[in-house]
């Protein structure tokens, strides 16, 4: 490409192409196409669905591979088109074309950044869907309110990305907010993406529940686990589980159901407890609770086999220790990740789901730590 009058845009475009080329080498489009061909052939076998678990595994892998290749090919076309647009701006000294190219350049940089982060999601479970549990910690009613704020933040984040979610369980506090909430994010790489959110979150603000208007510090814990697939072999003997049924409850402990549709499963050997109440029937709640319990037990099993996986669930005590992010609303406004040092002053935006930069920084921080440990 000849020299042009817009050197800043040209340098940015060259850097963009270099970044893309490095990502393409990591993802390896040719290898992806071969995988897709093999998986497509397997998916076309007439008796595949005689084994539903194997069929789900094949179709899930095929969908993930096709999605990754589609993103790569779309970016290829967009970068090629941008290069043509920049050449047009150069040859005709067209400022309108330059403005259009500059806008597309910014959009492409963001798309490339997102794809680059995907290349860092290479953990055993990173491609899985995720189950997220938020629990209020120290701080009384403010902590319960904070837990509800975090639930909204993550649901808004998923909505921004078009990721389907399902709230599986909510346990309301007496005065306001939530004791705990569990929801599922049904998207590829949801676990790898959200697992960096696991840990203790801290809120500092003037309490709306304090008549004297004092500043209050409160905490909530976020746990993230990969959702089990039918191909994972986790058999739980019936005598290892205690089943309790009760009526679903709403804010303030008010019953929202006239039947005992809510289900609590307790895995006696490990003490793991899972409650579900948001489905319409006891049968549906039990099925959802069983799947989440299996997911937690699978993760526990893997953690026992490999001590390095202890950090996967991020099941921590929500108090002063082990904090990963602070949300300060008073006396100043700042959200800061204590691991990556990433911080922003737009607290309302963050609490409305604008957390991509925090997640990206967390994934890069985790990848750097893994590389340093190797």
Swiss-Prot record:
Principal cellular location given in the protein's record: cytoplasm
Residue list for modification N5-methylglutamine: 254
Disulfide bonds: none
GO cellular component terms listed in the entry, alphabetical order: cytoplasm
InterPro entries: PCRF (IPR005139), Pep_chain_release_fac_I (IPR000352), Pep_chain_release_fac_I_sf (IPR045853), PrfB (IPR004374)
Post-translational modification, as annotated: Methylated by PrmC. Methylation increases the termination efficiency of RF2.
Transmembrane annotation, as ranges: none
Cellular localisation: Cytoplasm
Keywords tagged on the record: Cytoplasm, Methylation, Protein biosynthesis
PANTHER family the record matches: CLASS I PEPTIDE CHAIN RELEASE FACTOR, PEPTIDE CHAIN RELEASE FACTOR 2
Known function: Peptide chain release factor 2 directs the termination of translation in response to the peptide chain termination codons UGA and UAA.
HAMAP family the record matches: Rel_fac_2 (MF_00094)
Protein name in the entry: Peptide chain release factor 2
Lineage of origin: Bacteria, Bacillati, Actinomycetota, Actinomycetes, Micrococcales
Encoding gene per record: prfB
């Amino acid at each position: 490409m000849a020299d042009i009058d817009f050197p800043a845009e040209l340098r940015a475009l060259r850097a963009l192409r270099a970044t893309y080329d490095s990502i393409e080498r990591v993802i390896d489009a040719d290898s992806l196409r071969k995988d897709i061909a093999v998986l497509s052939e397997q998916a076309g076998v007439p008796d595949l669905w005689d084994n539903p678990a194997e069929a789900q595994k094949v179709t899930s892998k095929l969908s993930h591979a096709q999605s990754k290749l589609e993103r790569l090919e779309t970016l290829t076309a967009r970068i090629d088109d941008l290069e043509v647009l920049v050449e047009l701006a150069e040859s005709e000294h067209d400022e309108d074309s330059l403005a259009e190219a500059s806008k597309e350049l910014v959009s492409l940089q963001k798309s490339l950044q997102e794809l680059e982060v995907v290349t860092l999601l290479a953990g055993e479970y990173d491609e899985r869907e995720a189950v997220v549990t938020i629990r209020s910690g120290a701080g009384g009613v403010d902590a319960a309110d904070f837990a509800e704020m975090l639930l909204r933040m993550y649901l808004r984040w998923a909505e921004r990305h078009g990721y389907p979610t399902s709230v599986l369980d909510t346990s309301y506090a007496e005065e306001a907010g939530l004791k705990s909430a569990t929801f599922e994010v049904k998207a590829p790489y949801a676990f790898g993406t959200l697992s960096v959110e696991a840990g203790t979150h801290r809120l500092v603000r003037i309490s709306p529940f304090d008549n004297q208007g004092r500043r209050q510090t409160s905490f909530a814990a976020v746990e993230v686990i990969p959702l089990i697939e039918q191909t994972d072999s986790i058999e739980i003997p019936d005598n290892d589980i205690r089943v309790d049924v009760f009526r679903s409850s709403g804010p303030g402990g008010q019953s929202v159901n006239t039947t005992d549709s809510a289900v609590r499963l307790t895995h006696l050997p490990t003490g793991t407890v899972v409650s579900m109440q948001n489905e319409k029937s006891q049968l549906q709640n039990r099925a959802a609770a069983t799947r989440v319990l299996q997911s937690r037990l699978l993760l526990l099993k893997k953690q026992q086999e490999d001590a390095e996986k202890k950090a996967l669930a991020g099941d921590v005590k929500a108090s002063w220790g082990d904090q990963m992010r602070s949300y300060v609303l008073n006396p100043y406004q700042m959200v800061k990740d204590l691991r990556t040092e990433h911080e922003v002053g737009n607290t309302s935006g963050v609490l409305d789901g604008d957390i991509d930069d925090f997640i990206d920084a967390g994934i890069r921080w985790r990848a750097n730590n893994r590389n340093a440990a190797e």
